[in-house]
């Protein structure tokens, strides 16, 4: 299954490492990543894939709650199917 993870918060050291480590722990592969810092505000979008027989979006979101709290971030995960459906005419 493919999904999109968005990460936002005040910039500081270790954000990418924390999110990538949690993804690895969950068996989530990072296919592509885009990140930028604007006026001290960090934003990152990750295109990820995972075996949906091993985990699901709700489990990943719940597991990211620790990273959100520890890193003072907002992390959201959504199925890529949502984005695909929005672009079908």
Curated annotation (Swiss-Prot):
CDD domains referenced in this protein's UniProt entry, alphabetically: ACT_1ZPV
Stretches of the chain forming a coiled coil according to its record: none
Any Pfam family matching the protein: ACT_6
Residue intervals of the ACT domain: 4-78
Gene3D superfamilies xref list: 3.30.70.260
Domain of life: Bacteria
SUPFAM superfamilies (alphabetical): ACT-like
PANTHER family for the chain: UPF0237 PROTEIN MJ1558
Family statement drawn from the similarity comment of this UniProt entry: Belongs to the UPF0237 family.
NCBIfam families: PRK00194.1
The protein's name in its UniProt record: UPF0237 protein DIP1286
Annotated source species: Corynebacterium diphtheriae (strain ATCC 700971 / NCTC 13129 / Biotype gravis)
